[in-house]
């Protein structure tokens, strides 16, 4: 390839390269803006689950939960609080998410599960299992007696029964299988 020696031709080529570079940067910027415009909470939670990022979540009742999102679905997430404890948190109950590390996520990720909240909950708990749940600001602990798409029934430590509408449950705290309690 021969070097361009004509100053006018060199200036024309340099201008064309500069113009192409500017168009490329503008296109990338437009793509980033478009991806940001498409961001959703579910997409962000999916991105955070994929990164295994440590987060602090605040619920609509003002409760803060810390941990790693291990699974993100359309209607709920699994927040791993420790090796033995996890919380199922309804997506609609999440008010804010703060990542402890500085991550630049677009919030356009795809959820790992598209099941309903009742199906999501039932896939993580068993009859007889001791769980804790939050229904609005009410915290209740007990053993699971029954669970269907509408109601979760707990046998509470005081000998009573607690009936919760599954779609009203904001959070379910569970023990992780493989922990000492389940061995």
Give the predicted meaning of each segment.
Residues 1-66, 70-141, 145-183:
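Short glycine-rich, low-complexity segments
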